[in-house]
Amino acid sequence: MSRGLELLIAQTILQGFDAQYGRFLEVTSGAQQRFEHADWHAVQQAMKQRIHLYDHHVGLVVEQLRCITEGKSTDVDFLLRVKEHYTHLLPDYPRFEIAESFFNSVYCRLFDHRSLSPERLFIFSSQPARRFRAIPRPLAKDFFPEKGWEKALNNVLSDLPLRLPWQNKTRDVGYISAHLVETLGEETLRHSHLQVANELFFRNKAAWLVGKLITPDATLPFLLPIHRSDDGELFVDTCLTTSAEASIVFGFARSYFMVYAPFPAALVEWLREILPVKTTAELYMAIGCQKHAKTESYREYLYYITSTDEQFIEAPGIRGMVMLVFTLPGFDRVFKVIKDQFAPQKEMTAAHVRACYQLVKEHDRVGRMADTQEFENFVLDKRQIDPTLMALLLQEAPDKITDLGDKIAISHLYIERRMVPLNIWLEQVEGAQLRDAIEEYGNAIRQLAAANIFPGDMLFKNFGVTRHGRVVFYDYDEICYMTEVNFRTIPAARYPEDELASEPWYSVSPGDVFPEEFRHWLCADPRIGPLFEEMHDDLFRADYWRSLQTRIKEGHVEDVYAYRKRQRFCLRG
């Protein structure tokens, strides 16, 4: 092939990425209008559309390249020259880091995720020292309380691009000011100021103002969720100023923000100061660059695996009937492989399981479902696999394992944040911690249901506890939409003997769910049963679930709060 062809291919890939990110920004830029018009269903559709854009544009580029090369095979030297030309296009490119990930995706689509090596792919960044280039305008604006904090806060709210009237701006400014005084004290505030991002962060039914509260001693988060009333008026729902609160808002179990970010690396770097525990991958994920977040996540994994002598082991917890889960003892993620054969009671296919995971990726996760990254032909060094785990992999998923000599390749797996399984957590805690966990579990079920998600298998083992004590669902093989379920009350027994029979005295059809049965496995522990009955007894009634279904079918979209309801200004004393 002509040497000029390599440059043409490199340019075609970069132009394809330009087109993809342009559409990404176009969809994102509509977030403000969707919020102002309260078009919540359009919010959900835009979220799915934006996720699909990436793979769609990768596919378009792949088809272009097949036409350009006329289907001829390409040798290794040719591919290396394509990457070299592509690398030379990036030094002055404003989104070079995501462009590298796009190149990787095109390569993997062309070559079916095979022959993946640092020479052919951007497994490591071509410009590791350059996080981002100079940008044409600042990301944020400073506000100083020269005439008092209430005046400064009024200026912050007045400066927003939102075109709706305020319900009561003076009231909200008073709430925020009082919260800052209560949290930091007047003396500290006298020597502090705000730096507020120019772009709002939209998600669900809220527009988030994201800023930094810069004090003499520290830089703190300054987050204001702005909501729209049914009358079309704006109000601030709360003010969050701790790193823990900010971490939850930007958490891995939440949908991606819609924030206009033509220079994503610069925004990630700006956010890092108020989200110090978040990795680079998590920050890119939060702003919707999920494919590049996958690249960064893999780099974080490579950094860890090359600096430890730990071995992969089976993950703690009850072994699943569908997934084989393993981890590294000191790593904060788990690796999930779909088994070749499922337990008899799991009447489903691997394709169904993958569809469930994709549903979660595209759906509003409401802070209650863990995000995942999907990998193909994932290579592990045999020396770093515990023999017991190796035997288990070969027993449960032999069709997915390829022996490469001193390594193995797993044809398909998911990587997910590691949490403490809820069943283990409940065994270890007492008192207030136990009560909080049961309250959190019930809240998770309610919020998932309100978002039109029924977990299917509600056993404690299918949920995890995060470092912030939040309960998150992570076992998706039986997940379905609430509207697909037939919630029924168990009919009264005809005779006393019916209740002692091994088979039910009533008919059961596919899709039937009897909430009364939840009590048998959720309340069996005498420490847990009374707490569950006190806080969540309505979960055992079919009419509760049917009422949620009615609201969903009527088009109602529930509010989702990334903080405790007691923190809302409208509920404070």
Swiss-Prot record:
Q: Which InterPro entries match?
A: AceK_kinase, AceK_regulatory, Isocitrate_DH_AceK
State the superkingdom.
Bacteria
Q: Which GO terms describe its cellular component?
A: cytoplasm
Compartments where located:
Cytoplasm
The protein's GO terms of the molecular function aspect are: [isocitrate dehydrogenase (NADP+)] kinase activity; AMP binding; ATP binding; phosphoprotein phosphatase activity; protein serine/threonine kinase activity
HAMAP family the record matches? AceK (MF_00747)
Q: Which family does it belong to?
A: Belongs to the AceK family.
Name this protein carries in UniProt: Isocitrate dehydrogenase kinase/phosphatase
What is the protein's species of origin? Answer: Enterobacter sp. (strain 638)
Q: Which gene encodes it?
A: aceK
